[in-house]
Each structure stands twice: as structure tokens, then as C-alpha cells.
Amino acid sequence: MSACQTPLIVALDFPTRDAALKLADQLDPALCRVKVGKELFTSSASGIVESLCAKGFEVFLDLKFHDIPNTTAMAVKAAAEMGVWMVNVHCSGGLRMMSACREVLAKRSGPQPLLIGVTVLTSMEREDLAGIGLDIEPQEQVLRLAALAEKAGMDGLVCSALEAPALKAAHPSLQLVTPGIRPAGSAQDDQRRILTPRQALDAGSDYLVIGRPISQAADPAQALAAVVAEIRS
């Protein structure tokens, strides 16, 4: 497997295996990792992960597991056995759920995936949280969940880059994975709390997830190269 030399993760947000692999064939695994989400995994099952790994990519399995502790832990274990590089769970599942995931990984031999907690989805704003009974700012809820994640021994968090400075200050050991990244001039789409790649890295993000600006570009390889140039400038 080629070691990726950048913090970039390209989201393979496609409905079919063929479409995802068509994009992957245009990308360099030395310049990016790839993310497999719910739609693609549901349509393609574990075979898509195997195919991407065979092409040299490190895979972030973005299924945001959230269930009772044992069920979630077994799902995380299954993901590890597929050979994924990163897997995530919802921090809102609680301390016992996250701790169970950490423990099940510690008991297995071989490479360990990064275990990442999802705090507040980047599409959510204060009014969205209020609608589910949380009358607080997203940043406050992120910090609450981050404290639980660190206590459970998680490797990092998915968060908006706008939350990254506060998270790095409070929890410097946690690696921060930031979606909602848009190169300068890109449309915001359905991600609300966004920054450019350079801004996100400067804010403290460790990994950057980029989707449509690369996946829907006329030339995805060129679009990826432009983002790499931006973060290296």
C-alpha cells in the first residue's frame, strides 16, 4: 500500500461501485486517501473496500456506527478485519459505547484502524440542535462530546474546522478530521460550517475530507493536484 503524503481524503459519494472505482482510477493514492460512506457501502458491501485497498488506497469507512455498546463494537471489529485505515462512530452513543469499541480493537492483532468519533454533523446549526432538544451552540455540544471521546480513548474526532482551534487547545492528543472543506471559489452545497483547505489546516485540522470539488470536477486528477498545491503553498 502506498503511504499517502497529504492530509486529503476524497469522498467517494457515489451510488455504485463502478462509479466510485472510475474516480479512484483517476486519483493517486500517494496524494489522497478515500472515504466510503453509507450509500456506496450499502450498494457495494465490503467488496468496494477490498477493491480500493487493492489499488493502494487507505480507506476511511464512514458509516458513523451508533447502537448499543456490543453491537457497535462488533461492527468496528468487522471494519478492522476488512483492513480499513479509519472507522467512525457517533460520540452521542455515549462513553460505554465508545469504550467498547476501543477495547475490541485493543484485543485484536494486526494493524489497527484509527477510531474516530463523530461530534456534531457539519450540516447542523443551532436551530437544528434545538429541534432535537439541545438548546446550545454546536461548538458547545462538540466540546461536550470531545471530552467523552478522549475519556473513552478515541484516536480523534470528526468536526468542523471552526471547532478545531478549541478542540486542539482542550484535547491536543486527538486527531481532527474535517469535512465540509471547499477550495476557494467552490459552492457550499449542504455543508454549513466550512473553510478552505489551507484555513482548515491552520485552524488545527489533521485530515481534510473533500467531495464534490474533486469528484464532480471535469478533471478530478487536476482538481486534486490543485488542492495539494494549495495546502503546500
UniProtKB/Swiss-Prot annotation:
A Gene Ontology BP annotation from the UniProt entry: 'de novo' UMP biosynthetic process
Highest taxon of the lineage: Bacteria
Keywords, in A-Z order: Decarboxylase, Lyase, Pyrimidine biosynthesis
Protein EC: 4.1.1.23
Enzyme class: lyase
UniProt-annotated binding residues for substrate: 13, 35, 62-71, 122, 182, 191, 211-212
Pfam family name, one: OMPdecase
SMART domains in the record: OMPdecase
Protein's name in the database: Orotidine 5'-phosphate decarboxylase
Organism: Pseudomonas putida (strain W619)
